[in-house]
Swiss-Prot record:
GO molecular function annotations of the record: identical protein binding; L-threonine 3-dehydrogenase activity
Subcellular location: Mitochondrion
The protein's name in its UniProt record: L-threonine 3-dehydrogenase, mitochondrial
Pathway field: Amino-acid degradation; L-threonine degradation via oxydo-reductase pathway; glycine from L-threonine: step 1/2
Organism: Sus scrofa (Pig)
Length: 373
């Protein structure tokens, strides 16, 4: 096939170029060689041209997790309801199903993922399918399959079809030997959870695909994300979500981390906006493939003190989970996100007082509605 022959010639010339000894050779931004997976000779996909001037066609994997539904809502407001496809392996609740396109997508099924991208003319892919820190430690084999094998499928499909790919990373990508206060973008990582290891793997594989295949890979290391309208998903920072629900409902909360455990945190609206902003940033503005982003850092005790300003009778007790505490003790206390602020203008809106007020107002309103019903 002439196209395959031409691509092999391009790859041969690229790989045969001499290196300078201290820096990798300058590579073209887009496709450099053959696809990471060979296309079967009998493959039969419908191909449709897509203009870069049009709105992106978006696919979100793992869309029923903490961030997917909110991201879909934000992107649909920006790009149109029908241009954003939410996907997961679970059955969506009715309000999600009715809010816009939803399809079944198993990231471990490479052929199915590829068909979805081609048949829906996808140009942007947000890859949110993952098992989080505490859940991953309880099921390492499943975490390895979802977080690593699934990532490989997504990377290959994205490279083959020239997608712009976003993969979130995490504070969990760092370990006990990393600088903790603050933690810069580039430093020793060496995490000690399968979740963290898989995220470092994702960061490095994405950067490799950027240089090797020209994949437009973009990644943010999220701090702990606090959201009002979703349930905790098995992460070490879940206490900072659960505390508001329990404070409004019961007036007390049992925390599974030590009172002095400081971790970086962010309200979900800031998180989703940062994700959209880095995806919309001009390619030439990005000096890194993976950026830290941050808003605030606090301890459980500091968060409880802020809650007490609104609910004076609130009580917090501590029953430390040794597994989660060990994970938290290996993570950054504060993120240095100065590069993101410099390169693409990142700026957070929510500090701790605004966060607490927003969360308590949300849960207070829902509690009053429930009582009325």
């Amino acid at each position: 096939m002439p196209v395959v022959k031409m691509l092999k010639q391009v790859a041969s010339r690229t790989l045969g170029s001499p290196a300078c000894g201290c820096q990798p050779p300058t590579l073209p931004r887009r496709f450099l060689g053959t696809s990471p997976r060979q296309i079967p000779a009998d493959a039969n996909f419908h191909s449709t041209s897509f203009s870069e001037a049009n709105q992106p066609r978006v696919l979100i994997t793992g869309g029923l997790g903490q961030l997917g539904v909110g991201l879909a809502s934000l992107l649909r407001k920006r790009f149109g309801k029908d241009n954003v496809i939410l996907s997961d392996i679970r059955k969506p609740p009715e309000h999600v199903f009715l809010s816009g396109p939803f399809i079944y997508s198993d990231i471990l099924d490479y052929k199915n993922l590829r068909e979805i991208v081609v048949n829906n003319r996808v140009t942007w892919l947000f890859h949110y399918s993952a098992l989080l820190s505490a859940v991953g430690e309880a099921n390492v084999s499943l975490a390895r399959a979802v977080n690593i094998t699934g990532l490989h499928n997504v990377l290959d499909v994205a490279a083959e079809h020239g997608l712009r790919l976003f993969v979130p990373s995490t504070i969990g990508a760092f370990g006990p030997t990393s600088p903790r206060n603050p933690t810069p973008d580039l430093c020793i990582q060496r995490p000690r959870t399968i979740y963290g290891v898989s995220k470092v793997h994702a960061e490095l594989m994405g950067e490799y695909y950027y240089y090797r295949y020209g994949l437009d890979f973009r990644c943010l290391r999220y701090p702990g994300i606090i959201s009002a309208d979703s349930q905790p998903g098995g992460g070490t920072t879940d206490y900072a979500v659960q505390i508001f629900q329990d404070a409004v409902k019961n007036g007390r909360f049992e925390c599974n981390l030590n009172p002095g455990t400081k971790l970086p945190m962010m309200y979900i609206d800031d998180c989703l906006r940062a994700t959209l902003e880095v995806m919309e940033a001009p390619a030439e503005a990005l000096s890194l493939r993976t950026y830290n982003v941050n808003a605030m850092s606090f301890t459980p005790a500091e968060l409880a003190q802020e809650v007490l300003k609104h609910i004076p009778e609130f009580q917090i007790t501590y029953n430390v989970d040794s597994v989660r505490q060990a994970i938290a003790d290996s993570w950054p206390m504060n993120f240095d996100d100065s590069t993101a602020r410099r390169d693409w203008g990142w700026k957070h809106d929510f500090d701790l007082p605004e966060l607490v007020t927003t969360m308590l107002n949300f849960h207070g309103a829902h509690s009053r509605v429930a009582q009325a019903n």
